[in-house]
């Protein structure tokens, strides 16, 4: 702006000099002085008008709103757009039309020559050079609030479930700052899930991050749905599921399983309404461009943050957090950044930190995140999972060997851990009982080779007693789920933390050594196990 003013002054000076040089007529000195004074007066009087216009406050988000640019280059998911006027801000959303559909581009870099480099949130097939692009003047925003529950949307908040538009009056930018220190809650509090094995041995923290490790067919989806169901019943909270790089088939299955289990309401059977649903779903499928997969976790988190700020305890699921990193690496390569270790983006830790630090408790509500984590080639030192581990408060490991025994949930009680399992947080009784359970199960695991080779008869009396208790504990860690009632025929059980501690404390102390093992399989509280045991003993006699 300063340069423009200077050049205009220079032009005016040259205009003053040029007429005298061209005419060759000598003017009266006094007249020329008066003329120059009048010119100076004109310039002085007009200067405030220019400065006033310059000092008029312009909102940052409206600085380039409505500016139209045109596409200069398309390379895969990267689109370069040139503007004549003001450039859009970094992270601004640009819009254009592609094959009759709305295409959103997010500004990633300013390249110079009035050109910005953007990342497309959908396919760029069909785009042409010279095509017009409009700056929205704002970042990508998604609908938030209860209207999103029971619905599936994409990264830019558009519904993809063929049930009509989302009836939300509120939207929110997907790029938010993490809560300030003064806003965050410093109280370490357990989020009781009603699932015995989780609450006893690897309790979740309100506002914590939990890594969920599990292969195919070990009950990961069922565990996720039960957590969603129990949080809604016990805490009245909502859940958000972000499918990052999800297989379309898996996402489709999850949606219908949630309807069948009662977690969500089928809008097609409820006059288009999803009232009563407990979970919002945001999908960026495996076949979508890296821009969508890199941003869909932020879209889901934004919805979760909205519920948290209304005072809710929210569950936020991400499947799979590795694919968030993978998409970030693709975007980074397309933008021309030099890769770091193993080909990942140089901003890996920054990108992960920006996401994870937003998942926290405030004095109003909490977001508890359960993140499925894929470990490439089972290498825990790979930068992607290693960066994720730094943020986790607990891990829940699902074991195939436990699932093969028919014990569900198939959570490994020895491989799962939580920083919340501390006597200062959970209390002395809870901590002591959990340690006793783990000690008995660890000793049982060590004895299994001897049992397999020599049989139970070769064990000492103490070891025989310990093995019997361990097998009962193992079975008591199983639990019927509400969301699996249709398959098991058994009503689901939500077990309080007090009942869980009471039951395992008695098992470790040998109070139930006289009951058969079958009495502890697929029951809720210890009182149910006692009733079942008496019934089994009566039938046997």
Swiss-Prot record:
| Catalytic reaction equation(s) | ATP + H2O + 4 H(+)(in) = ADP + phosphate + 5 H(+)(out)
Pfam families for the chain? ATP-synt_ab (PF00006), ATP-synt_ab_N (PF02874), ATP-synt_VA_C (PF22919)
Its Enzyme Commission number?
A: 7.1.2.2
A single Gene Ontology MF term assigned here is: ATP binding
**Protein localization:** Cell inner membrane
* InterPro entries hit by this protein: AAA+_ATPase (IPR003593), ATP-synt_VA_C (IPR055190), ATP_synth_F1_bsu (IPR005722), ATPase_a/bsu_AS (IPR020003), ATPase_alpha/beta_chains (IPR050053), ATPase_F1/V1/A1_a/bsu_N (IPR004100), ATPase_F1/V1/A1_a/bsu_N_sf (IPR036121), ATPase_F1/V1/A1_a/bsu_nucl-bd (IPR000194)
Topology of the protein relative to the lipid bilayer? Peripheral membrane protein
According to the lineage, what is the superkingdom? Bacteria
Where on this chain does ATP bind?
A: 214-221
For this UniProt entry, what is the primary localization, expressed as one broad class?
membrane
Location of the region described as Disordered in the Swiss-Prot/TrEMBL record:
1-65
Subunit record text: F-type ATPases have 2 components, CF(1) - the catalytic core - and CF(0) - the membrane proton channel. CF(1) has five subunits: alpha(3), beta(3), gamma(1), delta(1), epsilon(1). CF(0) has three main subunits: a(1), b(2) and c(9-12). The alpha and beta chains form an alternating ring which encloses part of the gamma chain. CF(1) is attached to CF(0) by a central stalk formed by the gamma and epsilon chains, while a peripheral stalk is formed by the delta and b chains.
Family membership noted in the UniProt record:
Belongs to the ATPase alpha/beta chains family.
User: Per its database record, what is this protein's job?
Assistant: Produces ATP from ADP in the presence of a proton gradient across the membrane. The catalytic sites are hosted primarily by the beta subunits.
By what name is this protein known?
ATP synthase subunit beta
């Amino acid at each position: 702006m300063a340069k423009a003013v200077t050049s205009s002054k220079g032009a005016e000076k040259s205009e003053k000099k040029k007429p005298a040089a061209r005419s060759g007529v000598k003017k009266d000195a006094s007249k020329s002085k008066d003329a120059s004074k009048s010119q100076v007066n004109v310039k002085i009087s007009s200067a405030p008008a220019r400065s006033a216009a310059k000092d008029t406050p312009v909102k940052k988000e409206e600085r380039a709103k409505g500016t139209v640019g045109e596409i200069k280059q398309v390379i895969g998911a990267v689109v370069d757009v040139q503007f004549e006027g003001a450039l859009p801000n970094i992270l601004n959303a640009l819009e254009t039309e592609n094959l009759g559909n709305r295409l959103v581009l997010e500004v990633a870099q300013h390249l110079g020559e009035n050109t910005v480099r953007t990342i497309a949130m959908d396919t760029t097939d069909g785009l042409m050079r010279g095509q017009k692009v409009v700056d929205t003047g704002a970042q990508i925003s998604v609908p938030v609030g209860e209207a999103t529950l029971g619905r599936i949307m994409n990264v830019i908040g558009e519904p993809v479930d063929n049930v009509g538009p989302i009836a939300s009056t509120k939207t929110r930018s997907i790029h938010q700052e993490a809560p300030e220190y003064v806003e965050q809650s410093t109280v370490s509090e357990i989020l009781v899930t009603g699932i015995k094995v989780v609450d006893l041995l690897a309790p979740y923290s309100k506002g914590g991050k939990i890594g969920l490790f599990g292969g195919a067919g070990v009950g990961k989806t069922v565990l996720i749905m039960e957590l969603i169901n129990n949080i809604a019943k016990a805490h009245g909270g909502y859940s958000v599921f972000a499918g990052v790089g999800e297989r379309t088939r898996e996402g489709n299955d999850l949606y219908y399983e949630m309807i069948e289990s009662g977690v969500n309401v089928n809008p097609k059977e409820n006059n288009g309404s999803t009232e009563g649903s407990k979970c919002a779903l945001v999908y960026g499928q495996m076949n979508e461009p890296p821009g969508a997969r890199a941003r869909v976790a932020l879209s889901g988190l934004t919805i979760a943050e909205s519920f948290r700020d209304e005072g809710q305890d929210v569950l936020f699921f991400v499947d799979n957090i590795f694919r968030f990193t993978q998409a970030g690496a693709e975007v980074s390569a397309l933008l021309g950044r030099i890769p770091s270790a193993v080909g990942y983006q140089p901003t890996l830790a920054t990108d992960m930190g920006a996401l994870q630090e937003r998942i926290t408790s405030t004095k109003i509500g909490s977001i508890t995140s359960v993140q499925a984590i894929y470990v490439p080639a089972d290498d825990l030192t790979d930068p992607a999972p290693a960066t994720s581990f730094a943020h986790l408060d607990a891990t829940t490991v699902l074991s195939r060997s436990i699932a093969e025994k028919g014990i569900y949930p198939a959570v490994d009680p020895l491989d799962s851990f939580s920083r919340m399992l501390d006597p200062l947080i959970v209390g002395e009784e809870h901590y002591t009982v959990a340690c006793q359970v783990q000690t008995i199960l660890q000793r049982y695991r060590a004895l299994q080779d001897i049992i397999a080779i020599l049989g139970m008869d070769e064990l000492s009396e103490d070891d025989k007693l310990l093995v019997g208790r361990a097998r009962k504990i193992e079975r008591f860690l199983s639990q019927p789920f509400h969301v699996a009632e249709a398959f098991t025929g058994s009503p689901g059980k939500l077990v309080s933390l007090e009942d869980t501690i009471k039951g395992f404390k008695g098992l470790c102390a040998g109070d139930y050594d006289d009951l058969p093992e079958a009495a502890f399989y697929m029951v809720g509280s210890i009182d149910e196990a006692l009733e079942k045991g008496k019934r089994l003993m009566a039938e046997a006699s």
